[in-house]
């Protein structure tokens, strides 16, 4: 049983799940889980910053050789080596770069599960103060009875309030949803 109370651990499926599970097991055996996670986070940051790198990763137009050469250059320049660098190079040589963002997410889920950390996504209309963020984290920790890693997403379409997803649970306390509920009730009252 996983530390967070789930029996099966995080859901890691498909190509991304298989690659992430293999990397996690190897990193755990080599006692390099944190180093690999840090390197993958660094690469994920590069992906988020560079439209060209995202295009290289997602596009089937590039040959395997072109992808391998370009990824190798990016990894060398960023100083990403070891297990994480080899893993990314393997994904390139196997034409699986398109799944790399999902592989990184699946690896993170495995790491967090192994440490008893629960992931939560909190969508808000505008970025709250640090004090409010800490209150949200404390509330989620109390509910989960575990450490919680909060992914804060700003979504102006919510108008106000927040939407929290934690595991299989979701709480929608957004103003947008409340207004939609009022709108539906008024239509039904006609």
Curated annotation (Swiss-Prot):
InterPro entries: ATP_synth_OSCP/delta_N_sf, ATPase_OSCP/d_CS, ATPase_OSCP/dsu. PROSITE patterns: ATPASE_DELTA. One of its GO terms (molecular function) is proton-transporting ATP synthase activity, rotational mechanism. Disulfide bonds: none annotated. SUPFAM superfamilies: N-terminal domain of the delta subunit of the F1F0-ATP synthase. It holds the Pfam family OSCP. Its main location: membrane. It is found in: Cell inner membrane. It is a peripheral membrane protein. F(1)F(0) ATP synthase produces ATP from ADP in the presence of a proton or sodium gradient. F-type ATPases consist of two structural domains, F(1) containing the extramembraneous catalytic core and F(0) containing the membrane proton channel, linked together by a central stalk and a peripheral stalk. During catalysis, ATP synthesis in the catalytic domain of F(1) is coupled via a rotary mechanism of the central stalk subunits to proton translocation. Belongs to the ATPase delta chain family. F-type ATPases have 2 components, F(1) - the catalytic core - and F(0) - the membrane proton channel. F(1) has five subunits: alpha(3), beta(3), gamma(1), delta(1), epsilon(1). F(0) has three main subunits: a(1), b(2) and c(10-14). The alpha and beta chains form an alternating ring which encloses part of the gamma chain. F(1) is attached to F(0) by a central stalk formed by the gamma and epsilon chains, while a peripheral stalk is formed by the delta and b chains. This is ATP synthase subunit delta. It comes from Methylobacterium radiotolerans (strain ATCC 27329 / DSM 1819 / JCM 2831 / NBRC 15690 / NCIMB 10815 / 0-1). The lineage of its organism: Bacteria, Pseudomonadati, Pseudomonadota, Alphaproteobacteria, Hyphomicrobiales.
């Amino acid at each position: 049983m996983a530390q967070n109370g789930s029996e099966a651990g995080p859901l890691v499926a498909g190509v991304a799940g298989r690659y992430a599970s293999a990397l996690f097991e190897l990193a755990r055996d080599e006692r390099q889980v944190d180093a690999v996670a840090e390197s993958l986070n660094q690469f994920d940051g590069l992906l988020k910053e560079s439209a060209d790198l995202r295009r290289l990763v997602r596009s089937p137009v590039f040959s395997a050789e072109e992808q391998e050469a370009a990824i190798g250059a990016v990894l060398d320049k960023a100083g990403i080596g070891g297990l994480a660098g080899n893993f990314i190079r393997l994904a390139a040589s196997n034409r699986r770069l398109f799944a790399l963002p999902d592989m990184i997410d699946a690896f993170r889920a495995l790491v967090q599960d192994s440490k008893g950390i629960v992931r939560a996504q909190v969508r808000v209309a505008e970025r709250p103060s640090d004090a409010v963020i800490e209150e949200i984290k404390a509330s989620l920790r109390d509910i989960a009875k575990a450490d919680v890693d909060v992914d804060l997403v700003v979504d102006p379409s919510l108008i106000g309030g927040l939407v929290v997803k934690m595991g299989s649970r979701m709480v929608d306390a957004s103003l947008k949803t409340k207004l939609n509920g009022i709108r539906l009730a008024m239509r039904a009252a006609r």
